[in-house]
Amino acid sequence: MYYKGRMTQQDTLKPNPSVAIGALTVSNSAPLMVFAGPCQMESRAHALEMAGALKEIAGRLGLGLVYKSSFDKANRTSLGGKRGIGLDDAIPVFAEIRETLGLPIVTDVHEPEQCARVAEVADVLQIPAFLCRQTDLLVAAAKTGRVVKVKKGQFLAPWDMKNVVAKVVGSGNANVLLTERGASFGYNTLVVDMRGLPQMAETGAPVIFDATHAVQQPGGLGGSSGGDRRFVPVLARAAVAVGVAGLFIETHQDPDHAPSDGPNMLPLRDFEALMRELMAFDALAKARSAG
């Protein structure tokens, strides 16, 4: 083990190493998959357009896809930051995407009371990084029976995620995914320690790499967060070479005019070529591991 200390009860609570999301298998040894979509749900029309475009790309590549969009960006830098269309308006849109396009859905939950409602239309409940230690939220998400995807807090060591896994598994749900999105490195800056990927994998859970929030500059623009999307492909290649179950990539047709996280979102026009390259990296990395 990479983490130190005596064996405790949480060390005996094991997550599923292979998690099913519909027909998709998410595992550290399975082919690379992706959670992808715009940062926030801007409108029904935009969500359907993005989901349709991503489905076409995934179909051409033979890539497992879970559609991502947030109904509420509850941790915006400033009070005036746009937060999304809200839960009431988002639920029928998520349901429509699932039913008409056949795509599984992942979205964030911020409060325990949201979990049951969101679970009606989402296949995966995502716990934001800032909330990853909130026990009531983790337990409520786990008890829905949906897959629980937890982002590692920017303030946590990779091995500390064993305690997060134990909260979810100990609540009766072994289907948990862990996500690396970088660690705070001074002010307004994140850095990714790639050692954290295999360290989190030691929990037994599939590990996802968030390639777009990893290049975020939190609060870097004063009233909003900055970022540098040039480094999304760089970090994604590194993570896939190390070995991950999947990627998390926020993408948008016009990220420079997106209501949130524009500086670190990948332009949709670049998504297909990048994923084709990363799938080739993944095949090499996992063939080497299997050998």
Question: How would you label these PLM feature ranges?
Answer:
Residues 38-47, 65-87, 251-262:
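Glycine-rich, proline-tolerant flexible connector loops at the mouths of alpha/beta enzymes
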Residues 80-88, 101, 124-131, 187-194, ...:
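Active-site-adjacent loop and "lid" segments of alpha/beta metabolic enzymes
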